[in-house]
């Protein structure tokens, strides 16, 4: 019976995962040469690239190339970009998605026989990894705006609690019936279970 099936299911409750991101804070100039020789054709891909903040934290990356004189043939540009594209899925710091990176391929070299798309993609991935670590990387934590309405007598306790939760109080506005609205920015990770805590701290009178 259906009821028997339900009885055998284990239910695991866990906090939702917070969407952390990784980004960089300064410019980094790197060179990476991917070279392998093992009988027959080898592998060769050589890139010189800069990585810097793009200023757009809603977009993983922006890719540009300014190669002159055919140092890296045009047909390898997509492979270099693919290397960047694959790199931003899991960042070098803690495997969180990467945002806000501008990658520019400006030079490099190739081998008429040994170069391949795979070699240039690998070179770009290694260049990304090396540059990211040098470019003052940081983990971004989502911040949300919070509005709490509590009886005036509880404002001190609530503000102390918000500070403990790494919140930044932006303002306090008196409302009707002896209550105060506290407006704050607070890390999303600190908000799980907050409404329950708020009710217990205010005897059910905070919202």
Task: Mark where each language-model region is.
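Accessory interaction regions appended to the cores of large information-processing enzymes
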Residues: 1-207
């Amino acid at each position: 019976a259906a009821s028997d099936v339900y009885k055998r299911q284990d239910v695991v409750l866990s906090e939702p995962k917070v969407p952390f991101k990784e980004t960089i804070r300064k410019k980094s100039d790197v060179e990476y040469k991917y070279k392998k020789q093992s009988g027959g054709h080898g592998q060769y891909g050589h890139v010189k690239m800069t990585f810097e903040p793009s200023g757009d934290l809603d977009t993983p990356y922006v890719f540009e190339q300014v190669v002159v004189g055919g140092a890296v043939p045009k047909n390898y540009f997509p492979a270099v970009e693919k290397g960047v594209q694959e790199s931003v899925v899991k960042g070098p710091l803690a495997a969180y998605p990467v945002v806000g990176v501008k990658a520019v391929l400006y030079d490099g070299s190739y081998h008429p026989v040994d170069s391949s798309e795979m070699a240039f993609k690998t070179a770009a991935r290694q260049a990304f990894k090396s540059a990211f670590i040098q470019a003052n990387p940081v983990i971004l934590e989502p911040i949300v705006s919070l509005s709490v309405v509590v009886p005036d007598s509880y404002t001190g306790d609530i503000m102390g609690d918000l500070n403990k939760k790494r919140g930044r109080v932006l303002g306090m506005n008196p409302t009707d019936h002896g209550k105060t609205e506290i407006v704050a920015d607070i890390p999303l990770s600190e908000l799980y279970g907050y409404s329950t805590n708020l009710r217990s701290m205010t005897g059910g009178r905070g919202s």
